[in-house]
Amino acid sequence: MPPLPLITAQTEEKLLAFLTEHGHTKFRTQQVLDWVWRKRVTTFDAMSNLPPALKNLLAENFRFHTPEIVEIHGSADTTRKFLTKMEDGSLVESVIIPAAAAENGEKSERVTLCVSSQVGCAFGCKFCASGLLGLKRHLTTGEIIGQILSAEAIAGKRVNNIVFMGMGEPLSNFDNLADALEIITSHRGLEIGARHITISTSGFVPGLKKLAAYPRQIRLAVSLHGATDEVRDQIMPVNKKWPLSQLIPALEEWNRGRNQMPTLEYILIRDINDSPKDASHLVRIAKRLHAKVNLIPYNTVEGLPWKRPSEERCRSFRDAVHKARIPVTMRYEKGHDINAACGQLRLRKEQEKSGKTSR
């Protein structure tokens, strides 16, 4: 017999439909959600203002569960990575990132959590550890939400900024992602504003078209990493199915009617995509999309051949983009000393389990 559905995976619409079918009012739905999300109870018995019959109904049809964090890795810059085990034993990663101090020295209250959307990844970007073991499965809505709840419990603080930049391609798990977004943004859920949520895609065009029709103003980051088909074909297999000639129009469609700038994520890899010519191609795309650029010097993955460019080369690339009046930042990945780049911690753990740790 399959386990009962998670109460934390129910959108307000779905829970309302269930309770209405069983003769309960919208008010009762609101009460239940208040207990789940405002008071953070973990049993139905704790919902003291509900009638016993309703508590029994909930207990017979739903359950509470948060995934287990099996490893926590701290970092000198206070970033922490969590390795989280799902009920079937699958491992995923999340990273909690406190904001840096503001320029005026005041403490920022932003707490960002990077979450995963799949166990592994099918897209096989050549520089990324997540795809080395392939795709195992999609995460459920409850497992996506569970990462947030587990991280908050360990950190002792509420997350107020979420980036879907962990393991997996979020837009290929769109239905579960959409339900998770409803719970995250809902006034009767986690209540995190849509503009404090970023979805990253490697260029999965069918999912981008669905996201374009999605009503909430979720931010978008595109893992571009190459500004020509020649470069993207070399390091991102997704480009062979959805090349730039399809990706860029899909991004324009997403941006139509929105007052938002997409972010072009661009990992700088030595002798692959870090030349002045590459910078010129990137500028051309950024101007067409009215996008900002986030440059990330490559975070070395054991067993892969790619190298990080020199700091001088990285700065030169950034300056070329900046001179073209494109908003650009250079992000050195926090947590470089804790395997914090996408997929590295899970890869190491799986290799240890199979006795195939790379040397």
UniProtKB/Swiss-Prot annotation:
S-adenosyl-L-methionine binds at residues 168-169, 200, 223-225, 299. One of its GO terms (molecular function) is tRNA (adenine(37)-C2)-methyltransferase activity. It catalyses: adenosine(2503) in 23S rRNA + 2 reduced [2Fe-2S]-[ferredoxin] + 2 S-adenosyl-L-methionine = 2-methyladenosine(2503) in 23S rRNA + 5'-deoxyadenosine + L-methionine + 2 oxidized [2Fe-2S]-[ferredoxin] + S-adenosyl-L-homocysteine; adenosine(37) in tRNA + 2 reduced [2Fe-2S]-[ferredoxin] + 2 S-adenosyl-L-methionine = 2-methyladenosine(37) in tRNA + 5'-deoxyadenosine + L-methionine + 2 oxidized [2Fe-2S]-[ferredoxin] + S-adenosyl-L-homocysteine. [4Fe-4S] cluster binds at residues 121, 125, 128. GO terms for biological process: rRNA base methylation; tRNA methylation. The keyword Ribonucleoprotein does not apply. Its EC number is 2.1.1.192. Pfam families: Radical_SAM, RlmN_N. Its cofactor is [4Fe-4S] cluster. The keyword 4Fe-4S applies. SUPFAM superfamilies: Radical SAM enzymes. Binds 1 [4Fe-4S] cluster. The cluster is coordinated with 3 cysteines and an exchangeable S-adenosyl-L-methionine. This is Probable dual-specificity RNA methyltransferase RlmN.
